[in-house]
Amino acid sequence: MHIVVCIKQVPDSAQIRV
């Protein structure tokens, strides 16, 4: 579940980067 990590890291750039 790296998607959640991306949202926490860059919620502005990668809201839900799959």
Curated annotation (Swiss-Prot):
Described function: May play a role in a redox process involved in nitrogen fixation.
Alphabetic keyword roster: Electron transport, Nitrogen fixation, Transport
Protein name: Protein FixA
SUBUNIT field: FixA and FixB form a heterodimer.
Family indicated by similarity: Belongs to the ETF beta-subunit/FixA family.
This protein's encoding gene: fixA
Organism lineage string: Bacteria, Pseudomonadati, Pseudomonadota, Alphaproteobacteria, Hyphomicrobiales
GO biological process: nitrogen fixation
Origin species: Rhizobium leguminosarum
Highest taxon listed in the record's lineage: Bacteria
